[in-house]
Structure formats: structure tokens, C-alpha cells
Amino acid sequence: MVHSKKFRGVRQRQWGSWVSEIRHPLLKRRVWLGTFDTAETAARAYDQAAVLMNGQSAKTNFPVIKSNGSNSLEINSALRSPKSLSELLNAKLRKNCKDQTPYLTCLRLDNDSSHIGVWQKRAGSKTSPNWVKLVELGDKVNARPGGDIETNKMKVRNEDVQEDDQMAMQMIEELLNWTCPGSGSIAQV
């Protein structure tokens, strides 16, 4: 009953059916792709999902062929159309995700304009990164709670700031209050 050939993202149930799932790179959660009769069809479903999530750099079970007529990638499979699979994956991700728009927040230094601040990038290909809090380095210290137009729309109150954001803000304040060797001056917030 158990076949020796192993595919990425595919496993066999005790009663013989094959299941496929993939891990989302940002959410770090498994996305259930379905139950299949054969390991090959489950592997092809995984491949389609991997290409949708990661594009050309996806690690797949079968070779990915780049279409001549368009920039899309094709897998030798007739499981589902890429559009219907994309809609299915989006629906599953929305269901699994507590926060509808997951994001990455980090402390970032902008050397070009001498700024330091909290930088945020929301998940998705159509979103642009933005500054949540920006502080100019040097003699003049200027804190901008909104950052840019997008963040001005999302006024963040102190009681709504999550623990991670509070820690990032604390790190910025500690860095700004740190005395640089050789400078002799302390920046104040």
C-alpha cells in the first residue's frame, strides 16, 4: 500500500489516500490543498500552489515549463486552472489568517537621508513598504508618528500598539539615547 516514491508536500494516509499541503512563507502556517487518489496528483497540486506562492523560484516535484506566449509558469498538469487555484488558495489563506493583512515590522536605518525608524511591509505583491515611525538622526530629532500617507490613514493609538511594536519603539529610543563613541553628544527624543 505505501509507495517508496516521496514527493514534497505530499503524504499518505493510513487508509491509502494521498494528501497535499504547503507552508505559507510569511504566515508560517500549513495550507491544506486536498485529498487525492494518487501521489502524483497530490504532488502536482502542491507544485501549482508552490508556483502561485513563490513564482519561478518555487521548489517543485516536477519540472516547471515557462510559457512562450506569456510570463506565466505552467506545470504539466490538468488539475485546475491557475485562476481557480489562486482563488482557492486566497480563500484558504483568509480563513487561516487571524489578521487579514499580515505584515513584517523591523527597525531600519536609512543611510541616504539619515533616518532611523520602524519600517513595515504588508503581505501581498501590490503593497508597498512604509515607515511607521521615522526619526531624523543628528542635531535635529523629529519624530513622525504617521510616516507617509498610508500610515496617516491608520492612526495608531498607544493602547492599540502590539507588544512587538512597543519593543521596536523602545529599541529606537535606546539607540537614539545611546552615546556614539567619539561624538560626545546624546540624541534626545
Swiss-Prot record:
Coiled coil: none annotated. InterPro entries: AP2/ERF_dom (IPR001471), AP2/ERF_dom_sf (IPR036955), AP2/ERF_ERF_subfamily (IPR050913), DNA-bd_dom_sf (IPR016177). Induction: By wounding in cauline leaves, stems, and siliques, but not in rosette leaves. PROSITE patterns: AP2_ERF (PS51032). The keyword Transferase does not apply. Found in all organs, mostly in veins, epidermis and trichome bases. Specific expression in lateral root tips. The keyword Transcription applies. Keywords: Activator, DNA-binding, Ethylene signaling pathway, Nucleus, Stress response, Transcription, Transcription regulation. GO terms for biological process: ethylene-activated signaling pathway. It is found in: Nucleus. GO terms for molecular function: DNA binding; DNA-binding transcription factor activity. GO terms for cellular component: nucleus. It holds the Pfam family AP2. SUPFAM superfamilies: DNA-binding domain. Residues 6-63 bind DNA. Belongs to the AP2/ERF transcription factor family. ERF subfamily. Promotes cuticle formation by inducing the expression of enzymes involved in wax biosynthesis. Probably acts as a transcriptional activator. Binds to the GCC-box pathogenesis-related promoter element. May be involved in the regulation of gene expression by stress factors and by components of stress signal transduction pathways. This is Ethylene-responsive transcription factor SHINE 3. It comes from Arabidopsis thaliana (Mouse-ear cress).
